């Protein structure tokens, strides 16, 4: 019985430590641009996936790719997560006034999440600097 308790405590310690290892340094990403909305599709998220609507409210084509990241709200600030992901690099364009549903699945990279998070994407308009958009959710 004593060995079983030690094993259980060890496993719990390892699992707790793994979650903390995912939390990285404080994020320096600034979210901006009123001409773009990035919102959660109602009832679309679980602890392993979510869908967000990317809406271009400008009069220019909005460009974006497949890369994305997740940040966690921890101890009063947004923090990066220590997870590396690989992406194909196609470039997509979203016409003015259009919207697109983007689906995200992090089960194999981040596991099952619990807490407050945001999905981060970088986007840009032609001949302009890239900027970041965020879709927040809590599980």
Labelled PLM ranges:
Residues 5-11, 26, 44, 117:
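Generic low-complexity, intrinsically disordered sequence content enriched
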Residues 83-116, 122-126:
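Short, solvent-exposed, Trp/other aromatic-anchored flexible loops in extracytoplasmic proteins
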Residues 1-2, 36, 41, 100:
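Hydrophobic alpha-helical segments, principally membrane-spanning helices and signal/leader peptides
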Residues 1-22:
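Sec-dependent N-terminal signal peptides of Gram-positive bacterial secreted proteins and lipoproteins
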Residues 18-85, 123-139:
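Primarily secretory-pathway and cell-envelope proteins
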């Amino acid at each position: 019985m004593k060995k079983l308790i030690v094993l259980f405590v060890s496993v719990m310690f390892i699992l707790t430590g793994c979650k903390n290892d995912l939390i990285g340094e404080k994020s320096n990403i600034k979210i901006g641009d009123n001409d773009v909305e990035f919102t959660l599709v109602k009832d679309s998220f679980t602890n392993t996936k979510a869908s967000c609507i990317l809406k271009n409210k400008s009069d220019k084509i909005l460009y974006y790719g497949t890369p994305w990241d997740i940040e966690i709200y921890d101890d009063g600030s947004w923090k990066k997560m220590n997870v590396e992901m690989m992406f194909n690099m196609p470039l997509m364009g979203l016409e003015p006034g259009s919207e697109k549903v983007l689906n995200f699945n992090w089960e194999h990279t981040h596991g099952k999440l619990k807490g407050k998070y945001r999905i981060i994407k970088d986007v840009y308009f032609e001949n302009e600097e890239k900027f970041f958009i965020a879709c927040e959710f809590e599980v």
